[in-house]
Amino acid sequence: MLDLLPDLFDHYPSKLTLLPLAFRAFGGKRLFWGEVVTVKCFEDNSKVKEVLAQPGHGKVLIVDGGGSSRRALLGDLIAQSAMDNGWQGVIINGYVRDAARLSSFNLGVYALGAMPMKTEKLDQGQINVPIELGCVTVKPGMMVYVDENGIAISEESLNFAFLN
């Protein structure tokens, strides 16, 4: 079941929206899904760290970092915290660091690219607010489905029973 999205789009074409940004896979987990939690921030990952330090069983954090390539919003330490707290994955409209290490983690990590510089910690940003990614509105509580074909969101949890 590595190609989930083609089957979901075939079965639920009107219930899914594809995120149009060119995300790259960095984590070791390439297939994941879960309830959306959002963070909106710019070159400050304080809120990303705060959210991923909380229990996230069955959830995926989607971060709108404004697409900035000047600072990495996720590295190995925060990703380790996410794994330890049961998060399914992290999707970032921005950049990550520690790319080689992230590839060994059992965590879904998708971002626009990698760069080595960390952020400042100014405790700025917003948690669980609607965000815009490539003209698509992503709201907390939505569902996200990810595989190597792309990233799609839905207003509701989709049943996979038809795959059997």
Curated annotation (Swiss-Prot):
A divalent metal cation binds at residue 98. Substrate binds at residues 75-78, 97. SUPFAM superfamilies: RraA-like. It comes from Shewanella oneidensis (strain ATCC 700550 / JCM 31522 / CIP 106686 / LMG 19005 / NCIMB 14063 / MR-1). One of its GO terms (molecular function) is 4-hydroxy-4-methyl-2-oxoglutarate aldolase activity. The keyword Metal-binding applies. Divalent metal cation. Catalyzes the aldol cleavage of 4-hydroxy-4-methyl-2-oxoglutarate (HMG) into 2 molecules of pyruvate. Also contains a secondary oxaloacetate (OAA) decarboxylase activity due to the common pyruvate enolate transition state formed following C-C bond cleavage in the retro-aldol and decarboxylation reactions. GO terms for biological process: regulation of RNA metabolic process. It comes from the Bacteria. This is Putative 4-hydroxy-4-methyl-2-oxoglutarate aldolase. Keywords: Lyase, Metal-binding.
